[in-house]
Amino acid sequence: MLIRLLLALVFVIITVKPLAKVPNVLFVISDDQSYPHASAYGCRGINTPGFDRIAKNGVLFNNAISGSPGCSPSRASVLTGRYHWMIEHAGTHASTFNNKYFTFPDLLEKSGYWVGYTGKGWGPG
């Protein structure tokens, strides 16, 4: 009996995959915020210590463009990785976002990440 128990234990130890350590992903976007208006970019009139800490330990974009002059189409472009003119009504201020377009949060969730948001997930406006 003890041998069977030990064999079962060895089998379980061998077949169990170690949990893969996946990186945390934090994506933050703000509407209608001009490029230099955060202290991480050197703005002296606006104090943004939370963003500064994230920028120091993560990624700070210094050369990026908006996919569209409107906020909802820009968010839709960022979320899908497509130009706003390629995603039908999601590329406008219309209130529909067709489910046929996958977003990177959808893909992260399917990969086992916990995904959440506050504020606007997409739009409109």
Question: What is each of the regions a protein language model found here?
Answer:
Residues 2-5, 16-125:
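Formylglycine-dependent sulfatase
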